[in-house]
Amino acid sequence: MKGLSIRVQESPIWFALAEHLDFIATPISFNELYTALQQGTVDGQENPIASISSSAFDEVQKYMCLDGHTYAPESMIMNLDFYNRLTDEERAWIDEASVYARDTQRQMVTDMEEEMLKSIEDKGVDVCREPDLESFRKATETLYQDSAVTALVSPELTEGVKAAVAQYEAEHGEKGEKGHD
């Protein structure tokens, strides 16, 4: 990525990431991105597969790397007081339905993304499905210490996330390399 101009959201954290990965962070609005790619204003961009497909970025970019650097989970939220007033049976229904909805949604996203990737590849885009993630990890291992990050994210949150990742890896024996973005 060294020296490439990559469209990013206007955010201090994205600018810090650019420094760690040695690319040029170029903030451009999403609505202007197609033209920026087409005219060579930027060399690349990062977006979910669905956004790349629906915005036809595959018409103006030749390469795509599935590095899984972000994941945007959806949350089911309910007032705890309301939940606690439900009967055990009603809570069990909600818990069961929540797990079913989560699993179904994840499979639907996986299936839809695979269809979109096939279409993107059919249009001639070279999709790298297994990039060298270790080089990304090494380049960003101290990102959380960057002043742009610490100004926005508390050390306690950072340590909590690191602990959760370590626990996941210990339980699952993997580094979570299969992202959706």
Q: What positions do the PLM features span?
A:
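N-terminal secretory/targeting leader peptides
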Residues: K2-D181
